[in-house]
Regions:
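N-terminal helix-turn-helix DNA-binding core of bacterial DNA-binding proteins
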Residues: 8-51, 74-84
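Beta-hairpin "wing" of winged helix-turn-helix
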Residues: 61-71, 78
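Amphipathic alpha-helical dimerization/coiled-coil segments
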Residues: 1-12, 84-114
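Short, positively charged, low-complexity/disordered linker segments
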Residues: 68-69, 73, 112-114
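Residues within the DNA-recognition helix of helix-turn-helix
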Residues: 56
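A short, surface-exposed loop/turn module that caps and links secondary-structure elements
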Residues: 48-53, 106-109
Length: 114
């Protein structure tokens, strides 16, 4: 059964899922839920240039999913969203337990044109 809250907030939910639906942003947020990280450390973990990373971080900041802290020239990011934490728990429950081979799911999605 679909809740009336979800119906009322469908546009916001879709925007949130669109931002979180990007592989790199999903990885960024996964790392940030473990604690604060510098821009350089995030870039290294997700294998992005700092310029590419800054574009992803801008989208996450736009939805207030991350918060920043500056220490001299270093900028540190952390997760600022309980919704992100909950989403990652759900995704880990679906994909983290080996319920389905992710490579097979990805192949099916590509065949379906998604």
């Amino acid at each position: 059964m679909v809740s009336t809250k979800l119906i009322a907030n469908a546009e916001s939910a879709a925007e949130f899922l669109m931002v979180m639906g990007n592989e790199k942003r999903l990885l960024i947020m996964s790392y940030l839920t473990d604690g604060e990280m510098s821009v350089g450390a995030i870039a290294e973990k997700v294998m992005l240039s700092q310029s590419a990373l800054s574009q992803h971080l801008a989208k996450l900041r736009a939805l207030d999913l991350v918060e920043t802290r500056r220490d001299r020239q270093m900028i540190y990011y952390s997760c600022n969203s309980d919704a992100v934490r909950e989403l990652l728990v759900v995704l880990d429950g679906i994909f983290g337990g080996g319920k389905e081979d992710l490579s097979q799911m990805a192949q099916r999605l590509r065949r379906a044109g998604t």
